[in-house]
Every structure is written in C-alpha cells, then in structure tokens.
Amino acid sequence: MTHVEVVATIAPQLSIEETLIQKINHRIDAIDVLELRIDQIENVTVDQVAEMITKLKVMQDSFKLLVTYRTKLQGGYGQFINDLYLNLISDLANINGIDMIDIEWQADIDIEKHQRIIKHLQQYNKEVVISHHNFESTPPLDELQFIFFKMQKFNPEYVKLAVMPHNKNDVLNLLQAMSTFSDTMDCKVVGISMSKLGLISRTAQGVFGGALTYGCIGEPQAPGQIDVTDLKAQVTLY
C-alpha cells in the first residue's frame, strides 16, 4: 500500500477571495496538495495565474500547489487547444510558488512537443502530472494499461487516468490497471473511477498503489468528488 496525498481542487472565477481562503484554512489539516484550476477563466493569462499564486503563497508551507488547465476535450472548460494550450503550460514554469503542473495526454499529441515541454517544466523544478480523462466511459482493461504505459514514457513524476464507470466491472478494471502499473513502473500513479459508483477509487487509492486522491472544498469540481475533510478521514482508514 502506498502513501496517499489528498488534493483539494479549487476553481476561482477571477481571483482568490477572502472567503475561499477561509474555507481552505478551515480544512488545512486535510490538504496535502492544493489544485488551482484555471480553465474556468476565459482567456486566462500567466499574469492572472501568478497573482492568484501570490495570494495562496501565504499558506503554501502547509501544502504543495498544483496548477491545472483542463481543456473541453477532457471534460474541462478550457478553450485553448494545440499550441495555445501548450504555450500556456510551458509559461507556467516561470511562476514561483507552483510545485506541480498538469499536462494532458491524448493519443494524437505531438510527442516531441510534449517531451520538450515536460523537460522544460522539470528544469524549473516543477513536478509533472501527465493526465488523461474520459468522461464518457471506461475503456477495456488492456486499453487502460496501454494508456498508463504510453503516458509514463514521457518520464513525468505522476501519471493520472480518470474514467467514467457504467458498472462495477469498470471500477474493478481501473483499479486493476492502476495496481499493475504501480507494481511495475517507477513513476507515481493516480487512477480515478469517477461518479459515486467509483468512489472507492478515491477513498482506497493507496490500497491499489495510487499516490494522489482528489477531493473538493465545498462544490465538487469533478463527478464523485467529496469534501477533502471527509476524504482525508476515509483515506487514513486504510
């Protein structure tokens, strides 16, 4: 069983308000990583992100900061695609205070560009979470394993795969794929079976070799997320 860090996802509209800081402080003991989603901000700029990071730095000794721009293609709000998306991700490396950066994987990506950007982020001491999301279904077990394998070839610190289950076998396949990957590969793995049906993948993440589990502060930012306070309590049971 692996040690699991609890990620709290926030998605402020334009800035970090005092009420949000209070909500974070109220849950500070449950948070290992704070994920700042920025895809909900239309035409977001690096300067806007830097300003938000500055406000969060006050509490940063308590947790690591992960920045994520989730595109519409993978279930987010982000309109940036191709070079616009990759340029934003690359430019995030210049912001002090960011510890981790999410970069999406698709089967048709430009491999050389992705490799170059991931190395660039790592040169600036940012941990890379390479991720893939399927909000429609859960692929067969062999395809899940293949996606994990393809993502780890970029040598990230974390590989993350989130899929939507339609039955309990979908959940079991995701957990098996994650467990097998954890036993055979060096980088850390995250596997999420979304919605209430897949909740066990969030609460028992460490049992199957996972390193991160994602929760929310108040309103869920993804199907199946629960409040980080409850999530932390569940994770520590295992």
UniProtKB/Swiss-Prot annotation:
What top-level class of enzyme does the UniProt entry assign?
lyase
Give the matching InterPro entries: Aldolase_TIM (IPR013785), DHquinase_I (IPR001381), Type-I_3-dehydroquinase (IPR050146)
Q: Where does 3-dehydroquinate bind?
A: E35, L36, R37, R70, R202, Q225
Pathway assigned to this chain's UniProt record: Metabolic intermediate biosynthesis; chorismate biosynthesis; chorismate from D-erythrose 4-phosphate and phosphoenolpyruvate: step 3/7
Q: Which NCBIfam families does this chain map to?
A: aroD (TIGR01093)
GO BP terms in the entry: 3,4-dihydroxybenzoate biosynthetic process; amino acid biosynthetic process; aromatic amino acid family biosynthetic process; chorismate biosynthetic process
Fetch the Gene3D superfamilies from UniProt: Aldolase class I
Active site (UniProt): H133 (proton donor/acceptor), K160 (schiff-base intermediate with substrate)
User: What would be an example GO MF term here?
Assistant: 3-dehydroquinate dehydratase activity
The domain of life is Bacteria
The identity of this protein, by name, is 3-dehydroquinate dehydratase
Q: What is its EC number?
A: 4.2.1.10
Record's subunit section: Homodimer.
List the catalysed reactions.
3-dehydroquinate = 3-dehydroshikimate + H2O
What does the UniProt record say this protein does? Involved in the third step of the chorismate pathway, which leads to the biosynthesis of aromatic amino acids. Catalyzes the cis-dehydration of 3-dehydroquinate (DHQ) and introduces the first double bond of the aromatic ring to yield 3-dehydroshikimate.
Keywords associated with the record? Amino-acid biosynthesis, Aromatic amino acid biosynthesis, Lyase, Schiff base
Give the family per the record. Answer: Belongs to the type-I 3-dehydroquinase family.
